[in-house]
Amino acid sequence: YFLMGFQLFASGSYEIFNFPVDARNLALHNSASAYDGILLNNNPASLSKRANGNTYSYFYLPANIHFTGFQNVHNSSSGVRANKISFMSYGAIIDGETEKKSYAYDILLESGVKKEIKNLTSVGLSAGYLFSSIAGYKSQLLYSNIGIRSRMLRKRLGVGLSLENIGFLLKSYTDV
């Protein structure tokens, strides 16, 4: 019953949050990982200290769906900082009655930080903004992800915990 409640809650989410941004996340079915990663993902505490630079992503899916993403990760003595922008276009939507064409898309901006504590535990926080438009109806929200990760047994075993998509809806699709 507990797991079913979470599945029902997640079914009303924005699709761009569930979309994997690289091949590794696609293989893991977009699940969070306690291992180091070079991209800002579900658990911001899993950002690698070795990550540095820019990453570009582009996916083309059936039904004319396009995903484009850009991430910048910077490593400094105070921790790891990451910024990302993502755009997902769901293509044209044609009204069956009026034959009017409209579009659906999501734009996501996110920034995150990770701090390592005694080379054993990492704490991460990310915050973002999402703008979504479907056939002229628009929605906006602010969200955050909080994560913690610990490495044990000479860094062979990783354990992580993340709270994801903690959000505040600024404007619903149905607000006029």
What are the residue ranges of the model-derived segments?
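Hydrophobic h-region of N-terminal signal peptides that target proteins for export
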Residues: 2-10
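Subset of outer-membrane beta-barrel
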Residues: 9-176
